[in-house]
């Protein structure tokens, strides 16, 4: 799946979790919007979710995930596995082209349309067109800069935006203590 048009990163560092995303929305090779918000809070603000991919597909998955979070009373891993199972087996959901990063104070997970639920070893996850660049930058900053998670996530996205034409520097972020 070739996801272009956004970058989302989640950094878990020094007891804090920050998810950040750029604001660019691209239709083909045209920038349609600069300040979109692709990070959402759910479950009384205790869970963060960020999405990359087709906007309509991402909103559909976001709504489905939010319903699973409610069903499992905020248990992030159980909600993620339940969504991945539905995503993999439902004929309509299977066609959706989007990725999600979800996080609470204990867990960070990447959810894919292939039914994958991946928990990164180092607490850092990134998706979207500039995801690899942001991930590399965040890992380096985490190891060497001594910055808090919000600054690491923001700077990693800025670096990704300098490299990836589908990522801009209109960054929004949300943090959990």
From Swiss-Prot:
Summary of activators and inhibitors of this protein: Allosterically activated by HslU binding.
Major subcellular location class: cytoplasm
InterPro entries: ATP-dep_Prtase_HsIV_su, Ntn_hydrolases_N, Proteasome_sua/b, Proteasome_suB-type
Reaction(s) catalysed by this chain's protein: ATP-dependent cleavage of peptide bonds with broad specificity
UniProt-annotated location(s): Cytoplasm
GO terms under cellular component: HslUV protease complex; proteasome core complex
Active site per database record: 6
Keyword terms of this UniProt record: Allosteric enzyme, Cytoplasm, Hydrolase, Metal-binding, Protease, Sodium, Stress response, Threonine protease
Molecular function as annotated in GO: metal ion binding; threonine-type endopeptidase activity
Record flagged with keyword Phosphoprotein: no
Keyword Cytoplasm: yes
Role, per record: Protease subunit of a proteasome-like degradation complex believed to be a general protein degrading machinery.
Name this protein carries in UniProt: ATP-dependent protease subunit HslV
Source taxonomy: Bacteria, Pseudomonadati, Thermodesulfobacteriota, Desulfuromonadia, Desulfuromonadales
């Amino acid at each position: 799946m070739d996801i272009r048009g956004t970058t989302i990163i989640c950094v878990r560092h020094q007891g804090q979790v920050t998810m950040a995303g750029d604001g660019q929305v691209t239709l083909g090779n045209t920038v349609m919007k600069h300040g979109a918000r692709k990070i959402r809070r759910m479950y009384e603000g205790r869970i963060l979710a960020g999405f990359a991919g087709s906007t309509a597909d991402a909103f559909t998955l976001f709504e489905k995930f939010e319903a699973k979070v409610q069903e499992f009373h905020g248990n992030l891993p159980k909600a993620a596995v339940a969504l991945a199972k539905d995503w993999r087996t439902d004929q309509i959901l299977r066609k959706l082209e989007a990725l999600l990063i979800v996080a609470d104070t204990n867990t960070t997970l990447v959810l894919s349309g292939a039914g994958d639920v991946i928990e990164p070893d180092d607490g850092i996850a990134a998706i979207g067109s500039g995801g690899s660049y942001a991930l590399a930058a965040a890992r380096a900053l985490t190891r060497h800069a001594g910055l808090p998670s919000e600054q690491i996530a923001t700077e990693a996205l800025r670096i990704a935006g300098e490299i990836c034409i589908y990522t801009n520097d209109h960054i929004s972020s949300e943090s959990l203590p």
